[in-house]
Design a protein with these regions (language model features):
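N-terminal mitochondrial targeting presequence
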Residues: 1-50
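Single-pass hydrophobic alpha-helical transmembrane segments typical
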Residues: 36-79
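N-terminal topogenic membrane-targeting module
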Residues: 69-148, 153, 161
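Flexible helix-coil transition and linker loops at the boundaries of alpha-helical arrays
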Residues: 79-80, 118-128, 160-183, 200, ...
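Residue at a conserved register position within TPR or TPR-like alpha-solenoid repeats
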Residues: 97-98, 141, 189, 196, ...
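Residue-level detector of the short coil/turn that links helix A to helix B
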Residues: 102, 145, 200-202, 258, ...
Length: 395
């Protein structure tokens, strides 16, 4: 496969990250170079592999986190609309000091005042609007790098939602509201998990707790509906891509802890939930490839362990699938995730060839990955390919 087939016709251009208000108007996940590439420096990781000095790339949740963040803004907060004027007046002030004239103390003051006025005039504390204000406050805390404060706000909202579901969710007149609040609680849990696992908090066990809850709750609700049927007025549950996002988020958390044997089945389930012809599916396939390659599964009595060559061959097959999927997607469906998946999976094929001792094939793949990265302006890909080629020159 030639490198030119692996890329879009035009080089990727940076897309400004949408403001919260702009994101609210969108109705489907859209990747952007700003979000994916901005995450790449953190999310592309080099891992030692066995006795080899080779290192491999993993698109460590770039698309998944974008999906979670999109869902967090577009589906949790909902459009800031239908606010009574006394509430809207204070909210406009809070947003002004958030987006126009950044003054954290003033912004926080007006967010709190907005919530106080909403309570005074009797707005439903579990309406999209009021929950949205609280989650916007958490998003602002994240924006000003007060990550623990953001988590604290979201934990309070999550606990309030769980309390409501436990006390009122089983009442027949509340079935639709229960669905809406449970969806939001799942998405809030995913966001909390993301924050806990981030480089500024680094609490993987707490992240795992929230992510496991989100996955189990999502699948349990899906199974209940399939078994019992959807109740009148209950409304739709999360779609397949949203369910896949929760699976991917948990997989990323296990991957970060080098628990690859736990991450792999989650990536596989996420692939099954993802549209077969999407760039994010290619990313997931690449991630599964790396997760499989790095596995050292715990021994099971009475079962022979999977051999290293078998794991590498399986990993190679998934990397090839990632390239095939990304190659055959054309604009407008094609996004920069396809380009990243192509470049990274190509580099990883070089790693697999190097592990097999096929230096010529490895060099070919590293050169191809470097060329792809150059066209994209992906500096991390270029530097890693250069490092791999330098390593080969010493063999």
């Amino acid at each position: 496969m030639s490198g030119t087939r692996c890329l879009r016709q035009l080089p990727v251009r940076s897309v400004p990250r949408a403001t919260i208000q702009e994101a609210l108007g969108q109705r489907r996940f859209q990747s952007s170079k700003g979000s994916t590439y901005g995450a790449a420096k953190k999310l592309f990781k080099a891992y030692p592999y066995s006795v080899s000095l080779a290192s491999m790339f993993i698109l460590f949740g770039a698309g998944g986190l974008v999906f979670v963040n999109y869902y967090y803004h577009a589906y949790i907060i909902g459009a800031f609309k239908q606010f009574p004027e006394p509430v809207a007046k204070e909210l406009r002030k809070a947003l002004y000091f958030t987006n126009q004239d950044l003054k954290p103390h003033q912004a926080i003051k007006f967010y709190k005042k907005t919530l106080r006025v909403a309570e005074e005039i009797g707005m439903d504390p579990f309406s999209d609007e009021v929950l949205g204000i609280k989650i916007q406050l958490a998003a602002f805390m994240e924006k000003i790098q007060k990550y623990h404060k953001a988590i604290q706000v979201l934990e309070i909202v999550r606990n309030d939602c769980l309390d409501w579901i436990e006390e009122f969710g089983d009442k027949p007149e509340n079935v639709g509201k229960r669905t809406r609040i449970l969806e939001k609680t799942v998405a809030i849990s995913l966001k909390i998990g993301e924050l806990y696992s981030g480089e500024y908090v680094k609490e993987p066990e707490l992240a795992e707790e929230k992510l496991v809850w989100a996955v189990e709750t999502t699948l349990r609700e899906l199974q209940r509906r399939e078994t019992e049927g959807v109740k009148p007025g209950e409304g739709k549950w999360l779609n397949r891509e949203q369910i896949g996002a929760s699976l991917e988020a948990l997989g990323n958390n296990y991957e970060a802890q080098d628990q690859h044997y736990l991450a792999s089945p989650l990536f596989l389930q996420a692939i099954n939930m993802s549209p077969p012809k999407s760039c994010h599916t290619a990313v997931l396939m690449n991630n599964l490839s790396i997760s499989v390659a790095q596995q050292t599964p715990p021994s099971i009595p009475g079962q022979a362990p999977v051999s290293r060559p078998t794991l590498v061959n399986n990993a190679r097959a998934w990397a090839i699938k990632a390239i095939d999927v990304a190659t055959n997607i054309a604009p407008p469906e094609r996004t920069e995730e396809c380009d990243l998946a192509c470049a990274v999976a190509t580099h990883n094929l070089g790693e697999f060839a190097e592990m097999d001792g096929d230096i010529a094939a490895a060099r070919l793949k590293y050169d191809e990955a470097k060329s792809l990265s150059k066209v994209m302006g992906f500096t991390e890909g270029i530097s890693n390919a250069d490092a791999a080629l330098k390593r080969l020159s010493k063999k």
